[in-house]
């Protein structure tokens, strides 16, 4: 990570940390680098429903056109839809304006190459260098050399048709409650499921620019958990603001997180000979229960640090076709080049259709060990993480778990947070360990602030 780019592009408070001026510079530098690397003549631009999206899109479009690259605007669409459309013959890459699961005040910018993948560190570093040091040296064509802006009127329909082709052909008889998070999936997700024949009950599908992720979506599924049994539905699906992640709810209103989804899909694919190398990729945050359930099924697990980009890198390196995170970022490389909440939902529904089993039974394949996660807001997450006192405390409390649990303390890649996570069979001990480590982190942060 550099001064601008984090684990998922550039993010910050819109109009302050992520200003129109910075968006303009990112547009210029990003378009120049993609043009130089792949000969890109046009970039697809999409966004989520945040109020600041229009402002940042205008600045970004101006920057891209100012170096002679065309823009294809597609409006509000999920991040994975932009990844898919970036591979279209008329495109040479794409840009998404979104801050995913963050509150509406934040926004972000991330780039995709012509292959539909997020840019590697090497290219992000190059863009960052140009933004910070050499932006004025970039080309400034005039006359017919300036980039043009055009629309892609059938952008949503292209993605809907693509998504429908990846899942079960008929969902008739299934009732599904869909929490759209007032975000980028608010039109697409109900449309895909409805076209396949499901009875869809939409929730949080009226974005107003300020209500994205507000008490809804994959990070706040409590309303969905109540709605599924109340509606007599077969399951619920919750997306985040840009719909690159999915959390499900079974027919009884119980959460089915990313770890469960990986186990359900991975074991089914293994059983049908569709799991490449009988191997999956997960992160260090995955529950111990996932490892036990996959080991029982004869599935090998590769681990990475947190972040879907690292999961994808390992999948491509090792030839795996399924990987993901507990948070619901699930990647099926057979279908898309990034985490895709709608594709994940369709693969889950495919398992339900092919097995004839309700989601509660499928989720029971994994027993989740008690896990507790606390986010501690700090002034300097990297300074806290480098404190010897923190690592001494971690070692001390890890020893106290007697080999029946684990501790993971890590900085957030996108926010000023230190995440304290622990797992243990003894829930009382688990709570005590996390509370003590939160206290240690808070005290270290206070001391460092002077």
Curated annotation (Swiss-Prot):
GO terms for molecular function: magnesium ion binding; phosphoglucosamine mutase activity; phosphomannomutase activity. Its EC number is 5.4.2.10. One of its GO terms (cellular component) is cytosol. InterPro entries: A-D-PHexomutase_a/b/a-I (IPR005844), A-D-PHexomutase_a/b/a-I/II/III (IPR016055), A-D-PHexomutase_a/b/a-II (IPR005845), A-D-PHexomutase_a/b/a-III (IPR005846), A-D-PHexomutase_C (IPR005843), A-D-PHexomutase_C_sf (IPR036900), A-D-PHexomutase_CS (IPR016066), Alpha-D-phosphohexomutase_SF (IPR005841). It is an enzyme of class 5 (isomerase). The active site is at residue 100. Mg(2+) binds at residues 100, 240, 242, 244. It holds the Pfam family PGM_PMM_IV. Gene3D superfamilies: Alpha-D-Glucose-1,6-Bisphosphate, subunit A, domain 3, Alpha-D-phosphohexomutase, C-terminal domain. The modification Phosphoserine is found at residue 100. Its cofactor is Mg(2+). Binds 1 Mg(2+) ion per subunit. Activated by phosphorylation. It comes from the Bacteria. It catalyses: alpha-D-glucosamine 1-phosphate = D-glucosamine 6-phosphate. Keywords: Isomerase, Magnesium, Metal-binding, Phosphoprotein. GO terms for biological process: carbohydrate metabolic process; peptidoglycan biosynthetic process; UDP-N-acetylglucosamine biosynthetic process. Catalyzes the conversion of glucosamine-6-phosphate to glucosamine-1-phosphate. Belongs to the phosphohexose mutase family. This is Phosphoglucosamine mutase. The gene is glmM.
